């Protein structure tokens, strides 16, 4: 059995739900933003653990970056810069969270 065929109804339902939510936000005057997933710092939340990655470059050593645990900080910077009504559909990543109630990416 094709795994994609089994999941297709969920993909289509998710797409319809996101489209309806997006349409509501746009009708209310919100702007959709795409905050960067990679950041310089893992964050200050002691109970959240960011996933680290190494970015290879022309320099002698790779650069360490972290996948965000939440888009909140990036979105707050946009609000501080003058944006008033924003929303985002973006994945979040948390290390050490995996089980029946938690996923590393959500």
Mark where each language-model region is.
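Class II aminoacyl-tRNA synthetase-like tRNA-binding/catalytic domains
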Residues: 1-106
């Amino acid at each position: 059995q094709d795994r994609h065929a089994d999941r297709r109804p969920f993909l289509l339902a998710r797409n319809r739900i996101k489209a309806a939510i997006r349409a509501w936000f746009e009708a209310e005057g919100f702007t959709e933003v795409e905050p960067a997933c990679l950041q310089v710092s893992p964050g200050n939340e002691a109970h959240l653990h960011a996933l680290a990655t190494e970015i290879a470059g022309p320099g002698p050593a790779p650069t360490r970056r972290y996948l965000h645990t939440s888009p909140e900080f990036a979105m707050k910077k946009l609000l501080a810069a003058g944006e008033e009504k924003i929303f985002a559909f973006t994945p979040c990543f948390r290390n050490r969270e995996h089980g029946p109630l938690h996923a590393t990416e959500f």
